[in-house]
């Protein structure tokens, strides 16, 4: 099973790696939500390394890839895409009026960085595979 895990926006909590390890030991695979927008990651992108080494998944926000959350989030999102570390490209649509579910711009930018097939997999095939694992 996959668990979408969102850290506080200001920082990665102390000992968060212990929590993700605890989840992994119980067969729950953490997927870290929009790490590119976390202030702690923005200050030190290497903060993600322990989670990546553990095997945690990463969900990056499409608007970040397109620059909608500023240049720092965009740069980190692009770097994660180029390194092949992004599992899913998503919308982070909490409200249809305030933050609608639009993937288009981010998907186009991702395709320029990693190619059409890989970008498409981040929004179609991979999410589908994860969902199938939960709802079989």
Q: What name fits each language-model region?
A:
Residues 1-59:
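Extended substrate/RNA-proximal surfaces in nucleic-acid metabolism proteins
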Residues 34, 92, 127:
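Conserved, mostly hydrophobic/aromatic
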Residues 103-136:
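Mid-to-C-terminal alpha-helical segments outside catalytic/metal-binding sites
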Residues 85-101:
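Short acidic/histidine-rich active-site segments
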Residues 50-58, 76-90:
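Structural recognition of alpha->loop->beta junctions
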Residues 17-20, 43-49, 71-81, 103-106:
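Charged helix-capping and loop-helix junction motifs
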Residues 37-41, 65-68, 94-99:
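Active-site environment of divalent metal-dependent phosphoester hydrolases
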């Amino acid at each position: 099973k996959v668990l979408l895990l969102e850290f506080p926006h200001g920082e990665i909590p102390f000992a968060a790696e212990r929590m993700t390890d605890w989840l992994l030991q119980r067969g729950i695979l953490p997927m870290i939500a929009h790490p590119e927008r976390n202030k702690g990651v923005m200050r030190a992108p290497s903060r993600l390394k322990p989670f990546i080494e553990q095997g945690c998944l990463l969900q990056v926000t499409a608007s970040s890839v397109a620059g909608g959350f500023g240049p720092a989030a965009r740069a980190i999102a692009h770097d994660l895409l180029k390194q092949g570390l992004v599992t899913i490209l998503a919308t982070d649509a909490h409200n249809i009026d305030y933050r609608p579910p639009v993937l288009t711009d981010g998907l186009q930018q991702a395709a320029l960085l990693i190619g059409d097939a890989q970008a498409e997999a981040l929004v179609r095939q991979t999410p589908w595979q994860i969902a199938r694992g939960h709802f079989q």
